[in-house]
């Protein structure tokens, strides 16, 4: 059983829901990420999604795009992201870490670090660094069977997005290769956009669960404790990204961790009560 699966199983046994914060690696300061990840855990995070900066992030709204641009300008790439996870693991061997990003940085890493043995350098190095799962936004499930098999052999989960527009056929395709959890994108559009229709989310989750056996996390549009509580009543996990990025942007360095931790404590309390 993977670290992600163990985490969800433990939460289910306690009747609790997973809190999954997201941050772009290297934002808002290039060397703050491991420290910020520990602040997330202190605030009640169960899983951490770490965004890999990319120059053309098609699913990301302006808030996360800006964070990615800032991280890229500071020289943050896949090598640095894996180093951050490795550093985090020196003090935390239990909190699952998921890398979220796009195919291009993964493929570039494989090309640059090719071992000429037919195996994915990214998968092997991610596993060695302490990564638990991977969510590649632009990898369609019908083309992912070989990648999923490589990840599984290395002990990593492959996580997919589902959307309000996802058909039953797409859900079945995702179910064949997904592990860990699936991430339901509760809004049409990009991250941080629009108001969340909690009723629509509640109506969609039984459809997803009819096809998908892994836990279902919900993200996009969750900005406060009240919304998180409502979503937590129907989902297995609540994912929050853009709001965290907004809160820590422009904070002085010594306030980044405390501000994020305080916000997550509020969300955690709402989910648990």
Swiss-Prot record:
One of its GO terms (molecular function) is tryptophan synthase activity. The active site is at residues 49, 60. Its EC number is 4.2.1.20. It holds the Pfam family Trp_syntA. The keyword DNA-binding does not apply. It comes from the Bacteria. Tetramer of two alpha and two beta chains. HAMAP family: Trp_synth_alpha (MF_00131). This is Tryptophan synthase alpha chain. It comes from Albidiferax ferrireducens (strain ATCC BAA-621 / DSM 15236 / T118).
């Amino acid at each position: 059983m993977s670290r992600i699966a163990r985490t969800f199983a433990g939460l289910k046994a306690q009747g609790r829901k997973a809190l999954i914060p997201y941050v772009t690696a290297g934002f808002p300061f290039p060397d703050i990420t491991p420290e910020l990840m520990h602040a997330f855990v202190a605030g009640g995070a169960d899983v951490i999604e770490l965004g890999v900066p990319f120059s053309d992030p098609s699913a990301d709204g302006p808030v996360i795009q800006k964070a990615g641009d800032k991280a890229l300008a500071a020289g943050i790439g896949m090598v640095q992201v894996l180093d951050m996870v490795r550093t985090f693991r020196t003090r935390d061997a239990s909190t699952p870490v998921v890398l979220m990003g796009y195919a291009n940085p993964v493929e570039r890493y494989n090309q640059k670090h090719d071992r000429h043995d037919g195996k994915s350098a990214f998968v092997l190095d991610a596993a060695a660094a302490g990564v638990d799962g991977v969510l590649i936004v632009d990898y369609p499930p019908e083309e992912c069977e070989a990648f999923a098999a490589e990840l599984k052999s290395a002990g990593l989960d492959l996580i997919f997005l589902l959307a309000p527009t996802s058909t039953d056929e797409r859900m079945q395709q995702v179910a064949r290769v997904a592990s860990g959890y699936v991430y339901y994108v509760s809004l049409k559009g990009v991250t941080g956009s629009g108001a969340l229709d909690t009723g629509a989310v509640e109506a969609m989750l039984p459809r997803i669960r009819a096809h998908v056996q892994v836990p279902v996390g919900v993200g996009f549009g969750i900005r406060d404790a009240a919304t998180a509580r409502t979503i937590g009543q129907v989902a297995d996990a609540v994912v929050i990204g853009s709001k965290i990025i907004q809160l820590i942007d422009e904070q002085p360095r010594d306030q980044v961790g405390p501000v994020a931790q305080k916000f997550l404590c509020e969300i955690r309390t709402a989910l648990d009560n």
